[in-house]
Amino acid sequence: MLKKLHLHKTRALVIVVAFVLTVLLISQFFAGTGYASKTWIIMGDSLSAKTFRADTAYYDYVQKDLRCKVINYGKNGIGYKESGQKEPFYEQVDEIDLSDGDCLTIFGSFNDIGKNFELGSSDDITEETIGGCMNLTIRKILASNPSLRVGIVTPTPWLTNFAFDPNGEQNFSGTSREECDAYVSLLIAVAEKYNLPVLDLYHEFELNPDDPDTRAKYYVENEHEDVGVHPNSEGHRIMYPLWKPFVEDLLSDSGK
């Protein structure tokens, strides 16, 4: 009788242990897949575009950790209002598919300043001012996919008084610190109108491109550019820990 009781207890213990191990294995499996069923859409300028400037960019680091799908619409020279050869963000929205996205980030852009564009206010709804174009961009995105979680990311600091084209062919006079400060304040104010979360890289990113040593180590530097605008792969690696929790929060909230 005691042997049978012991046998029953042993079997029960084995069943319990097997159940616990199964639960742990299932938990580890789903933890390993991360956000594999989620899609992160990226809009941005040359810091988001896949170019020679960084073999590994911020979104590569984030994707490796979170395992989400990434659709990258980053383009060189683009911004909320930047026009001419590049369409602005509010026009790009009309050309891309947002229906399958779970979250979207817009990163940038100081391409908008230094071109004599009027800054405007956070209440503008017009193509004539930068503030108006920010509003138009966000409104179009939210109308296209109301369930999409949208996050706004301010530009990282650029080299003070950076001028892309000294010959003036791009009509770019340079980025003063005052212009950059005002631009970021406006972008944050516009985002707050729609209760959108903001990742403020302008104030939180620790690298200072005005420092020559920092620029040499963490920014693109070759015969074509030494401008303190585009972080290299190491610069993106330092930026990545700020991006990861921001994107993870957006993905976690999506679909709710």
Model regions and ranges:
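A short helix->loop->beta-strand "cap" motif at the edges of active sites that frequently abuts
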Residues: 144-149
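Conserved SGNH/GDSL esterase-like catalytic core that processes O-acyl groups on lipids
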Residues: 38-41, 47-132
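N-terminal secretory targeting modules
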Residues: 1-43, 47-54, 64-65, 99, ...
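Active-site phosphate/pyrophosphate- and oxyanion-stabilizing loops and adjacent acidic/basic residues
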Residues: 60, 139, 185-188
